[in-house]
Swiss-Prot record:
InterPro entries per UniProt: Ribosomal_L11_MeTrfase_PrmA, Ribosomal_PrmA_MeTrfase, SAM-dependent_MTases_sf
Chain's role: Methylates ribosomal protein L11.
Organism: Leptospira interrogans serogroup Icterohaemorrhagiae serovar Lai (strain 56601)
Name of the protein in its database record: Ribosomal protein L11 methyltransferase
Binding site for S-adenosyl-L-methionine: T147, G168, D190, N236
Taxonomic lineage of the native organism: Bacteria, Pseudomonadati, Spirochaetota, Spirochaetia, Leptospirales
Keyword set, alphabetical order: Cytoplasm, Methyltransferase, S-adenosyl-L-methionine, Transferase
Family label: Belongs to the methyltransferase superfamily. PrmA family.
Uppermost EC category: transferase
GO molecular function: protein methyltransferase activity; protein-lysine N-methyltransferase activity
This enzyme's EC code(s): 2.1.1.-
Catalytic activity: L-lysyl-[protein] + 3 S-adenosyl-L-methionine = N(6),N(6),N(6)-trimethyl-L-lysyl-[protein] + 3 S-adenosyl-L-homocysteine + 3 H(+)
Locations listed in the record: Cytoplasm
GO process terms (BP): methylation
GO cellular component, one term: cytoplasm
Length: 300
């Protein structure tokens, strides 16, 4: 089987809308190319480019979506984007993202691609939790700023014996981190069946019990999410999805939230939504190249 690989470079300010568009039209998969190095960017280090790079994959029989993508970019970015495409075989598709995905440390965790575990596990520093991850078609390599922000904060929190809900789990990377940090129960859910399969695979790769890390399909209205009580809710999801589900978020039985996936331009609007609908206040904030981490508590 063949796939159509579309290589893109687009203005960063339209990246969130672009991913929402891809989710809406339905593509085989996509991922965002960001950092590819062991050491995170220093606070005063120059950002080389304001563009965001994507690779998008279409099924061989998909005759429409490449044109739709081009029309979307013309309408939103004008001439300020680069696009090229090619046919690739299944094996190339499965291997493509590995070129850009290497082990790296963020906070208390070292993210290790599953295909590098034989060499990388032995070099992980003492006191650092290794997270074996194969993202497959799911979001969550750990390279994206939003995932880095959440991992960095999770390392500062006491998660031992906590009950944690991870909505929009993607590859399951944040749930893996919670399990390695001693959480007693993690419910990882995602509306994308590919993510459910990916998170389940990564759980097993890390030898985490399915009784500790439960992976299921669903969203904020998932029965277990709504009916059970949680010590922490993690949602690394775009602002548009968070806004659309704010009432469901407010009804979840937890007083502690970690949100990421919100761009700086939408931060104040999201904080106002939280204040008016969820109640409580922000207790910790961190920004990374235009993406925001918001830790929110209903009780001060």
């Amino acid at each position: 089987m063949r796939y159509r690989e579309i290589i893109l470079s687009i203005p960063k300010e339209i990246a969130e809308n672009f991913t929402s568009f891809l989710d809406e039209v339905g593509v085989v998969g996509y991922y965002e190319i960001l950092f590819d190095r062991e050491v995170p960017r220093a606070p005063d280090e120059e950002i080389i480019s304001d563009d965001t790079k994507f690779r998008v994959y279409l099924a061989e029989e998909d005759k429409e979506n490449e044109t739709k993508i081009l029309i979307f970019l013309k309408a939103t970015a004008g001439e300020s984007f680069f696009l090229e495409s090619r046919w690739i075989e299944t094996k190339e598709y499965e291997e493509a993202y590995k070129e850009f995905y290497k082990p790296f440390i963020i906070g208390s965790y070292r993210v290790i691609p599953t295909w590098e575990k034989d060499t990388a596990l032995g070099t992980t520093p003492e006191g650092i939790f290794p997270l074996l991850v194969n993202p497959g078609l799911a979001f969550g390599t750990g390279h994206h700023e939003t995932t880095r922000l959440v991992l960095g904060r999770m390392g500062d929190l006491n998660l031992s014996a906590k009950r944690i809900a991870d909505v929009g789990t993607g590859s399951g990377i944040l749930s893996l981190a919670a399990a390695k940090s001693g959480a007693s129960l993690i419910l990882a859910i995602d509306v994308d069946p590919n993510s459910v399969r990916s998170a389940s695979f990564n759980r097993d790769e890390n030898e985490i019990s399915s009784e500790v890390l439960v992976v299921e399909e669903g969203g904020f209205d998932h029965k277990k999410i709504q009916e059970q009580t949680w010590d922490l809710l993690i949602a690394n999801i775009t602002f548009a999805v968070l806004k659309a589900n704010i009432q469901k978020i407010a009804s979840i039985k937890t007083d502690h939230f970690l949100f990421s996936g919100v761009i700086t331009e939408r931060k104040e609007e999201f904080l106002e939504l939280l204040k008016n609908t969820v109640g409580g206040e922000g207790v910790f904030f961190r920004e990374d190249t235009g993406w925001e981490l918001i830790e929110w508590k209903r009780k001060g």
